[in-house]
Design a protein with these regions (language model features):
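Soluble or luminal CAZymes and related metallo-dependent hydrolases
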Residues: 5, 33, 37, 129
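N-terminal, positively charged/glycine-rich alpha-helical extensions of SAM-dependent methyltransferases
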Residues: 1-21
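Generic alpha-helical secondary structure signal
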Residues: 7-11, 28, 39, 81
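A short secondary-structure junction motif
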Residues: 20-23, 48
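Conserved SAM-binding loop
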Residues: 38-45, 50-151
Length: 151
């Protein structure tokens, strides 16, 4: 399987990965909008106890917010530095999130795991084959649940 990865995007995020949890840094806009996004998802679905997949999790901002609302979160990203930052922050905050360095396509091929909710926020514009990402994200869903894409 060809990896659906834009190496320039991976390199860009690797360079600034240490800034994920700085609310005044490169990711300030995400820090501002993240509580709104997490609350919106929770209001629509009541995520407590649900299995949530966060595709393109970055440093774990959304993953931790949904974990705090009681979701069982698996979060994936293709940038090793992002996963490292996310894991360190989760350990510091004593939260239990399953972070994985893998693409959505690879996760489907390896595990065929199902999730109640899939969040793919600010990700699709960073991949070369957007249709492939969309198709593979939808494979994870149980019937009659929601998927959130945000460009």
């Amino acid at each position: 399987m060809t990896q659906n990865i834009d190496q320039n995007e991976v390199n860009k995020f690797a360079e600034i990965a240490d800034n994920w949890w700085d609310p005044t840094g490169d990711f300030k806009p995400l820090h501002v909008i993240n509580p709104l996004r997490a609350n919106y998802i929770d209001q629509k679905l009541s995520v407590e106890g649900l299995k949530v997949l966060d595709v393109g999790c970055g440093g774990g901002l959304l993953a931790e917010a949904l974990d705090a609302k009681g979701a069982q979160v698996t979060a994936i990203d293709v940038t090793e530095a992002n996963i490292g930052v996310a894991e360190l922050h989760a350990k510091k905050m004593q939260v239990n999130i399953d972070y994985r360095l893998i693409t959505a396509e690879e996760l489907v091929a390896k595990e065929r795991e199902a999730f109640d909710v899939v969040a793919c926020l600010e990700v699709i514009e960073h991949v070369p084959d957007q249709e492939s990402l969309s198709k593979h994200v939808l494979i994870f869903l149980y019937q009659m649940v929601k998927c959130f894409f945000l460009l």
